[in-house]
């Protein structure tokens, strides 16, 4: 039996930082995607709100015109 056989396990330490770095990059990319999607949703919401307000104003003018 070899005395050093089970005493120490070799760990793949050089790969660990690369895997951690890759995971951090993926997390960062995911956060950027979420941030971009959120900004797009807010922009779309603003446009839709403005359009809704324009249509409501048009409707109110139409109702005032027919009421007189």
UniProtKB/Swiss-Prot annotation:
- The parts of the chain that form a coiled coil are 34-54
The UniProt regions of compositional bias labelled Basic and acidic residues, in chain numbering, are 7-25
Keywords (A to Z) from UniProt: Coiled coil, Cytoplasm, Cytoskeleton, Secreted
An example GO biological process term is: negative regulation of protein ubiquitination
Enumerate the residue ranges of region (Disordered).
1-34
Q: In Gene Ontology terms, what is one molecular function of this protein? A: microtubule binding
**Top-rank taxon:** Eukaryota
Signal peptide positions on this chain: none
Where, subcellularly, is it found? Cytoplasm; Secreted; Cytoplasm, Cytoskeleton
InterPro entries with a match to the protein in the record = SVBP
Cellular component terms, GO, for this chain's entry?
apical part of cell; cytoplasm; cytoskeleton; extracellular region
Q: Which family does this protein fall into?
A: Belongs to the SVBP family.
The entry's function note states: Enhances the tyrosine carboxypeptidase activity of vash1 and vash2, thereby promoting the removal of the C-terminal tyrosine residue of alpha-tubulin. Also required to enhance the solubility and secretion of vash1 and vash2. May play a role in axon and excitatory synapse formation.
Q: What is this protein called?
A: Small vasohibin-binding protein
Source organism (scientific name): Taeniopygia guttata
* Gene name, Swiss-Prot/TrEMBL: SVBP
